[in-house]
Amino acid sequence: MRVEDFTPKLIPASPGVYLMKDSSGEVLYIGKAKNLRNRISTYFRKDGDSRERIPFLMKKTTDIETILVSNETEAFLLENNLIKKYHPKYNVLLKDDKTFFCLAISLTHLWPKIDVVRTKAVTSSKKQIIFGPYVSAEACRTLLEVISQWFPLRTCSNREFASRKRPCILYEMKRCLAPCVNLCSHEEYEQTLDKAVLFLKGQISEIVQDLEKSIEKASKEQKFEQAGMYYRTLKLIQQAMEKQHVEKFHFQNIDAIGLYRKYQKTVITVLTIRSGKLLGARHFPFSENAQEDADVLSSFILQYYTNQPQTPKEILTPIPLNIPDLPSLLNKDTPPQLRSPKTGYGRELLNLAKNNAQVHAETTIQSSALPYEELKKILKSPDYPYRIECYDNAHLQGSHAVGVYIVYENDALSPKDYRTFSISSSAYNDLAAFHEVLSRRFISLTSSIPDMILIDGGRTQYAQAKKTLKELNLTGIQVVSIAKEAGNHSGSLKNEKLFCDTFPQGVLLPPTSKLLQFFQKLRDEAHRFALSRHRKKRHKDFLLPKEKIPGIGEIKRKRLLQKFKSWEQVMKASQGELEAIPGLTKKDIQHVLAKQAEDTYLED
């Protein structure tokens, strides 16, 4: 449905999912609704949706697609799957961690031990039991230290275990059963391991009951040393429980989720409490998010906990989430309890999580973020520039000229989106080069259109950018140019002049201006990137002419140098030696031999 054709009657009053798209067909936002007609209609009413991101989203949206489902749960799952498929910029998308810190118990060894592992797969199998993921390797080691105090399992490597002739010092410290020299039975070791597993699952009451039964049984069988070991473990746990009760941690497995939002920034923080210990926090920053708080949280929770081997017993959220089936979607066997306490220890944890999220936002994101309030005053525009491209060029007296642009998106530099253009102008001219780069950048539109273009230059460069965009029929892109004051190109802190639509003649910004400092950082990064690309081009085109042979690219050149160690030796290689190099064709060998003959002729 085209946005200009919208009438409420066109939208069914049914549960479903809607996709908001721009003119190129890119999906900008995906939402779900119990009643699609009511939900979509709010976007078209002035008093319908007060979120500050919505006007900007609607300005870019040209088409809305709807998908009907049977119920709200189906809508929730479909929304999550479509977000993963399309990666819309205005939704929360949790990027997959490459690896996770976990604790693993290998079941392939007769006497298993618990190890800290870093793995992509966080699911248990027949070969190993996985616990986690945890926030860091340090958190894993903290848990291992507690386990070694309470449950005397082996910690040595398999090689050391096999070579042991007598017990190590850990046995003397009552922190290992010494299975390496058969000082315990397999049954006794397995019982201790089972208790450690219960501990990792947070089932402390079951451990206490098992220990009490084990003490009684060992005493009846007159195994007093074994009974003493169980008694010491029980006392350690009981003492810790008393201490933790005062600290209100209660040996539970809990995740507390904090949410902080300001302007276009969203940070979600997960506080991880395992077996009563606060192990740390993980922070997930997002930008350009247009979802409501409840949708942000439910979408995040489904992505974060799906496919994890264990979910905590409780997940605390700052606001109630009205999705009845969500716990069972996270874990069918042992669904976690989702609750939003208003008072007590749970609320204290939630406040702590929110404070952590706020601190992370203020110290990490905002330290490098665009000073939006100052920009809004100067540009007289409420639109937030989500994507900024900064342009620069580099050359050596007009030769080996390159033009580049760098990208600042989602409140961070995005090096994967940086681009380089070899400038083809025969007689180099700054304005002509800039016109060429800008034209080539936008003529194919293979990447997202920026909200703002930043240029290092004065009024002339600013006017050239505006003229080029007009020739390309591109509207809605803010153009900003910054230049040092006339006659001042020293490294000292001086005012700089900013040119934009509201100040085409320029406005002076003092060196203390946060906006100027932000633009200067982007300009410096663009300049660094332009110089590096120029030097690479110069090195390739000018500094190594002797090594240029038709058909011999970088890979084949490396193979030749690996074999012959230097280019001089390559130029002395025989045809038979060249034929032994993998990947060289007959034609390549002919080119190398021709180059050898050419160099010999020139030397003569």
Swiss-Prot record:
UniProt cross-references to PROSITE patterns, sorted A to Z: GIY_YIG, UVR, UVRC
GO cellular component: cytoplasm; excinuclease repair complex
Segments forming a coiled coil: none
The GIY-YIG domain, residue ranges: 13-92
Localization in the cell: Cytoplasm
Lineage: superkingdom: Bacteria
GO molecular function term, any single one: DNA binding
Record-annotated UVR domain positions: 205-240
Keyword DNA damage part of the UniProt annotation: yes
Spans traversing the lipid bilayer: none
Signal peptide start and end residues: none
UniProtKB keywords: Cytoplasm, DNA damage, DNA excision, DNA repair, Excision nuclease, SOS response
InterPro entries: GIY-YIG_endonuc, GIY-YIG_endonuc_sf, GIY-YIG_UvrC_Cho, RuvA_2-like, UVR_dom, UVR_dom_sf, UvrABC_protein_C, UvrC
UniProt-listed GO biological process terms: nucleotide-excision repair; SOS response
Homology family: Belongs to the UvrC family.
Quaternary structure annotation from Swiss-Prot or TrEMBL: Interacts with UvrB in an incision complex.
UniProt name for this protein: UvrABC system protein C
Protein encoded by which gene: uvrC
